Amino acid sequence: MTSVLMIDNCDSFTYNLVDQFSPHGTIVIVKRNHPFYDGEIEAIMALTSICITPGPCYPAEAALNSCSIIGHLAGRIPILGICLGQQALGQARGGLVIFAHGKLSNIEHNGIFAPLFNPPRALPAGRYHSLVVEPARIEVTGQCNQLEVVPQEIMAIRHRDLPVEGVQFHPESILSSNGAAILANLIHRPCH
């Protein structure tokens, strides 16, 4: 049985994500982004993975505890960050968070979404963010290929050595094709 800790950054999309994980027989535990106690952090290690949800504001304001969890557990358990969650992953790994604008866009990727399905190289996806990550010690695995976006905004990142990944767009959105399969990748990804 797989289990996901959903760190809720007080976003209306959180339970859309829960619904996306549920058909896979996954137990989803939702916990608000409040300080975690030492015993809770050890209990998280028994879970299959962590998903850090979208939310408002900058990661330093809204996702501070998510950044702490990333620092404690990166490399010990697979972590997926979505929107604000990706920004928290980027910030925790030395990236900058800068302003952007949300819309429907084609996301070009390097095959990151291919293990469970064969997506088109330009994947239509719903973007609801106003901030994006600038890379530091992370690998860029997807970018927005819209002509009006210059330079291309980062839409997917991966830590170079750890099972820590993030997407800026919302895979649970009805605008995003193959979103359920993208989320399923997290469930089936081992921690190396």
UniProtKB/Swiss-Prot annotation:
Pathway membership: Cofactor biosynthesis; tetrahydrofolate biosynthesis; 4-aminobenzoate from chorismate: step 1/2
PROSITE patterns according to UniProt: GATASE_TYPE_1
Q: Name one GO cellular component term.
A: cytosol
Reaction(s) catalysed (UniProt annotation): chorismate + L-glutamine = 4-amino-4-deoxychorismate + L-glutamate
Its BP terms in the Gene Ontology are: folic acid biosynthetic process; L-tryptophan biosynthetic process; tetrahydrofolate biosynthetic process
Residues of the Glutamine amidotransferase type-1 domain: 3-192
Q: From the Swiss-Prot or TrEMBL record, give the protein name.
A: Aminodeoxychorismate synthase component 2
